[in-house]
Structures are given as structure tokens and as C-alpha cells.
Amino acid sequence: MLTPLQTYFPIAVALLVAVGLAAVMLALANVLGPRRPSEVKSTPFECGSLPVSPARERFSVKFYVVALLFIVFDIEAIFLYPWAVLLLPSDGYPGLGWAGYISMGIFVATLVAGLVYVWKKGVLDWAD
């Protein structure tokens, strides 16, 4: 029987190797890489075009609202995956049964009500 420390040891070794390799590559690039700064190298590169306006622009609040809505529905998807796996009985697990089905139905209904609300408020309308 493996102890918890023995179980996680390979993961810790892989993590240390990855961090060590990244540190070595960054150090080698810093030591061996050429340093010839110039004005051309210092200008921002935007698809081969010269920048025509400053990078600091104000965005409409709608972008942030849509980003928040995306995060909410992305989190919903994260909650739906384990629920879908655990809903039915399998491999000795009894399953969630009707209680799990009803609770997830309430959860999804709440999110759908929120979606209908923001839709009616015009948050998703980009016409103006």
C-alpha cells in the first residue's frame, strides 16, 4: 500500500523537472542571447502595421458584461460535467438519483432565468 507521500512523489518530481528546465532555458537565453537594442526592435509589432493610436483606449462596458456572462456560463459547464458523470449509478456508486436531477434542474433553471433577464435588458444587443 502506498502512502499519500509516495503517491504524489512522481507528480512532485515532474513539477520540479518542468520548473528546473524552464529556469535553465530562461537562464541560457539570458546569458547566451545577443543584446542589440534598437529603435525598430523597441516598437510594438501589430500584424506588420505601425501603431496608429495609443494602446490605452476605453472599452465599452458591454465588453466587460459579456466577459462576466461568459465566466458565469463557463462555470456552469464546469458544474454540469461532474453532475452528468455522477447522475446514473455505475461501478458500485449508487448515483445521484432524483435528488441530484432536481437540484441540477433548479440550478440550470436559475441560470436560464438569468440569461432571459440579461437578454430582455438588452445586454446581448450590440446594435447601438
Swiss-Prot record:
Family the UniProt entry places it in: Belongs to the complex I subunit 3 family.
Reaction equations catalysed: a quinone + NADH + 5 H(+)(in) = a quinol + NAD(+) + 4 H(+)(out)
Residue intervals passing through the bilayer: 9-29, 68-88, 96-116
Single Gene Ontology MF annotation: NADH:ubiquinone reductase (non-electrogenic) activity
Top class in the EC scheme: translocase
First-listed, main subcellular location of the protein, grouped into a coarse class: membrane
Record key words, sorted: Cell inner membrane, Cell membrane, Membrane, NAD, Quinone, Translocase, Transmembrane, Transmembrane helix, Transport, Ubiquinone
Topological relation to the membrane, as annotated: Multi-pass membrane protein
Protein function: NDH-1 shuttles electrons from NADH, via FMN and iron-sulfur (Fe-S) centers, to quinones in the respiratory chain. The immediate electron acceptor for the enzyme in this species is believed to be ubiquinone. Couples the redox reaction to proton translocation (for every two electrons transferred, four hydrogen ions are translocated across the cytoplasmic membrane), and thus conserves the redox energy in a proton gradient.
Name of the protein this chain belongs to: NADH-quinone oxidoreductase subunit A
EC numbers, comma separated: 7.1.1.-
Gene3D superfamilies: NADH:ubiquinone/plastoquinone oxidoreductase, chain 3
InterPro entries: NAD(P)H_OxRDtase_bac/plastid, NADH_UbQ/plastoQ_OxRdtase_su3, NDAH_ubi_oxred_su3_sf
HAMAP family: NDH1_NuoA
Subunit structure: NDH-1 is composed of 14 different subunits. Subunits NuoA, H, J, K, L, M, N constitute the membrane sector of the complex.
GO annotation, cellular component aspect: NADH dehydrogenase complex; plasma membrane
Subcellular location: Cell inner membrane
